[in-house]
Amino acid sequence: GTEVAVDTLRNGRFFFEGMTGSNEVEEYDVMAKDYGKLPPVWLSLWIGPDTHLKVKGENKLLKTWRVEGGSECQRFQQQLVDASRKELDAFQQSTMESMALGQALQNASGEQRESIIAKLKQTQDEQDSLQRCVMANDIRLMKQSVVNKVWMNSLDGLGKMLKYDKEFPYRNEVKELYESLPDEWKNTEEGKSVYTALYPPVVVKDGEMAADGDLYDLQGKVHHLSDFQGKYILLDFWSRGCGPCIQSQPELKEISELHKDSLEVVSLSIETKKGWEASVKNHPLAWNNWNDLQGRNGIAARYGVNGIPHFVLIAPDGHIVKSWVGYGPGLLKVQLRRWMRPQPQTVYGTHEGNPTVDYPAYETSNADALQITQVERTDSATILRIHAYYIPKFWIQLAKETHLVADDGTKCPVLRTEGLSLGKHFYMPESGEADFTLYFAPLPASVKTFDFMEGDGNEAWRINGIRVVE
């Protein structure tokens, strides 16, 4: 979103005044900037021309401060808050606890680190449970209420949870609410988003042929990705409210010029036409600047876009080479250097009589920054040689609990390392590439596959099903 006003709390009071973006009622969110002092949530205000609201809060739980006055939309927003006040207050308290634990985790190690991770999981489970209670309360109230913008906003939120949460328990209720809508509400951006969540398109994956569609420039001319067949394409899904998206634009410009003979950069806005036109006034793009005018429900849904910036590298023959999410200075150059070249093949061999596998195949990985270049098995150790790719001058870290797990369940701890120290920040060089070696206790002689595990937490890096035999 865009910051429209700032005030400081003085003597228990704050005041905002400004011009609305249109004659329609729109959502504005009040947030606090004091990290750790107030929960990382927002208070929703629905504001149109000549709207006057009074906000009252008697604690730090911003999301449940009471709002008086305003339109039908604001009154329904307050009804939603009142219906779940107990759960929302508990949720905000829990997020404060999570923030404190997250701060403590940065300097923790060993058993203390594991204890904090366990507590973080417990608070996350509490928050998930509370969120589901809130959703159930929302659904009950929505079934009894007239549809308005806040109603649709709530339905859209339920649709997003359905999209992201594989165990979402209210799919049937969301479908029932959606099916009850008149066509005029189904055809809104929120209505289309909920439809996409209920009936998602097939998402194209790395290695598959790229999805295409009608893509419009600012003059209304239609383009297609297939127009660039024979060249690499770097797709950039973005919006003006995404800080890293804007931060990436100078590097995208540099890349578009550096690789102009072999690669086309295509920035695809996921905003409305109005928002897109406004965004390029402040952030003009000198390369392909397109939009399918379907928000997250068109080509973005085909590529599984959730967070942004979301990048997709497409090969000259039209297949997807690699997709990734997020940005840091220099990362795009690192990624193109890595993926715009022939990929190394798996080779089985020996080194001084020990079995080796160069660039071993694996089943799944959440550790895109790590590429295992060789596995060597000796009588005294299993050796992993790793090449890392990451944001230049940023750090990566492997936990002291990093280990291997053989296909028979044998756990092999780290014996020693070369090139980095476990449990400590390793800052990447300016190239964004680095090599290091990990020595683990030997895997069983009969092993066919094993897993690399940085730890047991949900956020730990894992590479599963690493194959060491043909």
Predicted regions and their residues:
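N-terminal "domain-start" segment that seeds a small globular fold
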Residues: K192-L225, L285-N288, R341-P344
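Short, solvent-exposed, Trp/other aromatic-anchored flexible loops in extracytoplasmic proteins
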Residues: P413-G457
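Structural microenvironment flanking redox-active thiols in thiol-disulfide oxidoreductases
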Residues: I246-H283, Q294-A301
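Short, internal strand/loop/helix patches
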Residues: V280-D317
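A non-transmembrane, solvent-exposed segment enriched in polar/low-complexity residues
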Residues: G1-E126
